[in-house]
Amino acid sequence: MGDRFENLPDWQQRFVMEYEELANRAEKLHAILTKYDAGVLDFTPQTPIGVLRAQLSIMWAYMEILEERAEFEGVDLSILADPEE
């Protein structure tokens, strides 16, 4: 899990890891859709683009819900920020 999570209670570790995994997957899907829109995607998705767009939209909505929950429950998602930013 890494040092950045070691001082968090188990449930917060799971919460932060879930958010991080979702954010990473949404970023990758967004990159695919951006390349598709630009006509430079190097493969043809088997799933219709509309379904992929809907999936990304729902992923972003779920991220917003997790961010709101984090505020209510005192979970610091800034732990995921790149220290060089």
Enumerate the predicted regions with their spans.
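Extended, charge-rich alpha-helical interface modules
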Residues: 2-85
